[in-house]
From Swiss-Prot:
Homodimer. Interacts (homodimer) with RIGI (double-stranded RNA-bound oligomeric form); involved in both RIGI ubiquitination, oligomerization into filaments associated with viral RNAs and the bridging of these filaments. Interacts with UBE2D3 and UBE2N; E2 ubiquitin ligases involved in RNF135-mediated ubiquitination of RIGI and activation of the RIG-I signaling pathway. Interacts with PCBP2. E2-dependent E3 ubiquitin-protein ligase that functions as a RIGI coreceptor in the sensing of viral RNAs in cell cytoplasm and the activation of the antiviral innate immune response. Together with the UBE2D3, UBE2N and UB2V1 E2 ligases, catalyzes the 'Lys-63'-linked polyubiquitination of RIGI oligomerized on viral RNAs, an essential step in the activation of the RIG-I signaling pathway. Through a ubiquitin-independent parallel mechanism, which consists in bridging RIGI filaments forming on longer viral RNAs, further activates the RIG-I signaling pathway. A zinc finger (RING-type) spans 21-67. It comes from Mus musculus. PANTHER family: B-BOX DOMAIN CONTAINING, E3 UBIQUITIN-PROTEIN LIGASE RNF135. The lineage of its organism: Eukaryota, Metazoa, Chordata, Craniata, Vertebrata. Its EC number is 2.3.2.27. The B30.2/SPRY domain mediates the interaction with the substrate RIGI. Disruption phenotype: Mice lacking Rnf135 develop and breed normally. They are susceptible to RNA viruses infection. The gene is Rnf135. This is E3 ubiquitin-protein ligase RNF135. It holds the Pfam family zf-C3HC4_4.
Length: 417
């Protein structure tokens, strides 16, 4: 893959392997570089360390390549230079997929080179026209064969049946054998061209191939490596510790309601509910889950697509019931209040986050090492924020919903455990 170059830039040819992570075998995503110099996906390295599968001599944060591990756990930060290189590689790959591979830099003093890009649709249409012309040429060639006689048999390329023709052209005649072979070759070429033409026509937008042809076309047409479809979401290491917590009705505020399976919490559309008074009930739009997490590692996911303003996190059971999640010394969360208003709160300290709305949020809690991490979950998990947690009492999954948006809801996903 050639990097797009301009001015005095030097073109560099790279393959996907040059920018891949040995843990997930894919392109680096949010690359991070260890003190030893080796780079990995930030998420992959974090998950590997969490699972302790890469531990060396009791050190869980050893490098997966050189096996070197510092005395203290290094902080993982995105390598912006390496990320920029990956982004440029992906840009060049998209240009190739669109039908125009970037040209190498011109030699010194040479005239500027202009690359005309063509879309995939235009290329397919041009190929279709070329094949159609070839089919017409072959059919024309087929009708211009040597004249061996007249009649329907002659038109089909078979020997004449009259006695005089048999004398002139026996089955052992070299001329007749040569003609029969040529005729057979032409028929094969014509058949192959018509098949290619049919497949190309099926590839043009608006002319989808029949359903029964899809599998055949997939197996017969070879795609370049850069034209592969995106890989499906890889199984996360975090799913090994998956749980599906349920909401605790004792903590539910008066303007919220919970579904029958206790995994969906909704802002009420009508008047406040007349729940029984409880000292555990929140006075603002918040709710805890029943599960008290005190040891080990836990992971759960929350669907946020139907909620415009929300906060997701953990807190100790002793959190004040009139306190906001993240604004107390015993609660931590990420909070979405709209585009450009995404933040993390940890022990009353706010950190602005730069990210689009995560439709599904994954929460990772490692109570052994005191770590909390939030992920945007799609094809892959993308780390949003991580922090240290410390509490002398168990922690509970905790949620806030904007109380003036009736019908908005958050839903805890049922994960396979």
């Amino acid at each position: 893959m050639a990097a797009v170059c301009s001015g005095n830039a030097v073109p560099v040819w790279l393959s996907e392997d040059d920018l891949s992570c040995i843990i997930c075998q894919g392109l680096l995503d949010q690359p991070t570089t260890l003190p030893c110099g080796h780079s990995f996906c930030l998420r992959c390295l974090h998950d590997l360390w969490v699972s302790k599968r890469g531990a060396v001599d009791g050190c869980p944060w050893a490098c997966p390549i050189c096996r070197k591990g510092p005395l203290t756990k290094p902080k993982l930060h995105k390598n912006p230079l390496l990320q920029d290189l990956v982004d440029k590689y992906l840009q060049a790959a998209r240009e190739v997929e669109a039908g125009s591979e970037p040209e190498p830099a011109p030699a010194p003093r040479s005239a500027p080179q202009v690359t005309v890009q063509k879309s995939t649709t235009n290329v397919i249409q041009e190929l279709t026209d070329m094949v159609r012309q070839l089919v017409d040429d072959v059919k024309s060639l087929q009708t211009q064969r040597p004249n061996l006689g007249s009649g329907q048999d002659n038109a089909q390329g078979t020997p004449p049946t009259d006695s005089s023709s048999e004398g002139e052209h026996s089955l052992d005649s070299p001329k007749l054998v040569t003609f029969s072979i040529s005729q057979k070759k032409i028929q094969e070429i014509l058949h192959n061209l018509e098949e290619i033409q049919e497949k190309l026509q099926g590839s043009v937008p608006g002319r989808a191939p029949p359903r029964e042809r899809v599998q055949e076309m997939t197996s017969s047409l070879c795609l370049l490596p850069d034209q592969r479809r995106p890989a499906p979401r890889k199984a996360s290491h975090l799913s090994l510790w998956a749980i599906s917590p349920t909401f605790d009705l004792r903590t539910l505020s008066y303007n919220l309601e919970v579904s029958n399976n206790s995994r969906r919490v909704t802002v009420s559309r009508g008047d406040l509910h007349t729940y029984h008074w409880s000292p555990q009930r929140f006075s603002i739009s918040q709710v805890f889950c029943s599960q008290a997490l005190s040891s080990g590692q836990k992971y759960w996911e929350v669907d946020t697509r139907n909620c415009s303003h929300w906060a997701i996190g953990v807190a100790s059971w002793g959190m004040k019931r009139d306190g906001m999640l993240g604004r107390t010394m015993d609660s931590w969360c990420i909070e979405w209040r709209g585009p450009g208003q995404f933040s993390a709160w940890a022990k009353m300290k706010k950190t602005d986050l730069q990210s689009d709305l995560p439709e599904v949020v994954g929460v990772w809690l490692d109570l052994e090492s005191g770590e909390l991490a939030f992920y945007a979950v799609a094809d892959h998990e993308r780390l949003l924020y991580e922090c240290e947690v410390s509490s002398s009492s168990p922690l509970h999954p905790a949620f806030w919903l904007y109380g003036l948006s009736p019908g908005n809801y958050l839903e805890i996903k049922q994960l396979n455990t």
